[in-house]
């Protein structure tokens, strides 16, 4: 069993969580001391502060393999190489929901995936490819994709239960679907916890021989998060069935890691995280079809959906927000505002009044009161 810790990437997509660069470096060192196999350091193209953090983490004398997120985009893939990393994490969905969101045919998406994997390999990068929303993807199409990418030279293949709808029984049936196509013990798994099944799904996958499980400190991540690293370590230390590396992870530094993460959480926001969307890619999907990233309609339980204005926001999400507040959203104005948002490391707004007040500066040219910038740890 291997562990990929994604606290620094997926964790920061959680509403209420921001890590200053120094905290990211400390967390990387602690995770390395714990012996995790991979540390996912972020999505460098998302914001300048993330790029800087990746540069500084890459300069540390760590034993864990560092991996960075990139879309199917040559510039983003090249950026990962230029920042000094050896591993890139590419991702894409191939199911009907994903194709609708991309506005592409399945063949066009396959071609983009293939071209991106080949380009990354040409640059000398090791490639992990994640099929987004794999749990809601036709098993035959999934098997075809994995088999094709293995032939192209992808080093690792990952299965993402993006909205947390999988069950242990479905994970067991997945193993049978991949017989003759891809050994189960070469797969990575990324389980979300929207329905409370991330940990049992992970345990099932490990028992069946999965190669690697994604986890994060305190289980933080987009919406309800994912597998908590501390749960995974405690389980393996207590003789979890199927683990090939029992006793090789150090659990002693865990308390410090938890403290570092806790200090970076805005508790008021964190408590509202289950239906909050912070990643630009997720916001784009939600705007097109909420089912893309919500397994349950939030209104059914008396909650409401929150679109978070932060450095992780993309053009589609911002265009929707600007339209909502009656601000001109032509390309020039959009990029001017987006550049400003991405430059503010700890900006995080989800309430209509806060967002409206913040956006007034782009209507009137006035400075925004400091109270509308939410700093980590407050």
What is the predicted function of each stretch?
Residues 1, 7, 241-378:
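A mid-to-C-terminal "edge-of-domain" accessory segment
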Residues 1-3, 38-40, 63-69, 85-89, ...:
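Structural preference for beta-strand elements that scaffold enzyme active sites
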Residues 1-72, 309:
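N-terminal capping/small domains of soluble enzymes
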Residues 32, 38, 43, 63-128, ...:
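Active-site beta->alpha loop and helix N-cap motifs at the rims of alpha/beta catalytic domains
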Residues 36-61, 92-104, 132-133, 159-169, ...:
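Glycine-rich, proline-tolerant flexible connector loops at the mouths of alpha/beta enzymes
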């Amino acid at each position: 069993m291997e562990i990929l810790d994604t606290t620094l990437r997926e964790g920061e997509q959680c509403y209420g969580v921001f890590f200053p660069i120094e905290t990211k470096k400390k967390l990387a060192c602690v995770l390395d001391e714990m012996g995790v196999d991979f540390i996912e350091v972020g999505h460098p193209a998302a914001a300048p502060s993330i790029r800087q953090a990746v540069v500084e983490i890459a300069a540390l004398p760590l034993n864990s393999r560092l991996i960075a997120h990139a879309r199917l985009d040559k510039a983003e893939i090249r950026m990962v190489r230029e920042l000094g990393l050896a591993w890139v994490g590419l991702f894409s969905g191939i199911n009907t929901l994903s194709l609708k969101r991309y506005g592409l045919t399945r063949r066009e998406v396959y071609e983009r995936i293939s071209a991106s994997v080949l380009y990354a390999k040409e640059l000398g990068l090791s490639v992990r490819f994640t099929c987004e929303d794999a749990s809601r993807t036709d098993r035959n199409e999934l098997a075809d994709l994995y088999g094709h990418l293995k032939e192209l030279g992808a080093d690792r293949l990952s299965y993402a239960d993006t909205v947390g709808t999988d069950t242990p029984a479905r994970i067991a049936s997945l193993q049978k679907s991949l017989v003759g196509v891809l050994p189960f013990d070469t797969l990575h798994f990324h389980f979300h916890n929207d329905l409370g099944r991330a940990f049992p799904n992970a345990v099932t996958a490990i028992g069946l021989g999965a190669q690697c499980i994604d986890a994060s400190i305190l289980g933080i991540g987009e919406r309800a998060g994912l597998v908590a690293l501390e749960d995974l370590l405690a389980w393996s230390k207590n003789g979890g069935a199927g683990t090939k590396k029992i006793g090789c992870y150090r659990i002693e530094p865990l308390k410090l890691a938890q403290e570092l993460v806790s200090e970076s959480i805005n508790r008021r926001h964190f408590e509202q995280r289950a239906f909050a969307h912070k990643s630009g890619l997720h916001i784009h999907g939600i705007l097109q079809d909420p089912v893309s990233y919500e397994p349950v309609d939030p209104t059914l339980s008396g909650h409401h959906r929150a679109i978070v204005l932060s450095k992780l926001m993309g053009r589609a999400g911002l265009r929707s927000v600007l339209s909502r507040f009656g601000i001109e959203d032509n390309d020039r104005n959009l990029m001017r505002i987006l550049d400003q948002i991405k430059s503010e490391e700890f900006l995080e707004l989800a309430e209509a009044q806060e967002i409206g007040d913040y956006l007034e500066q782009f209507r009137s040219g006035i400075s925004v009161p400091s109270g509308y910038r939410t700093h980590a740890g407050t």
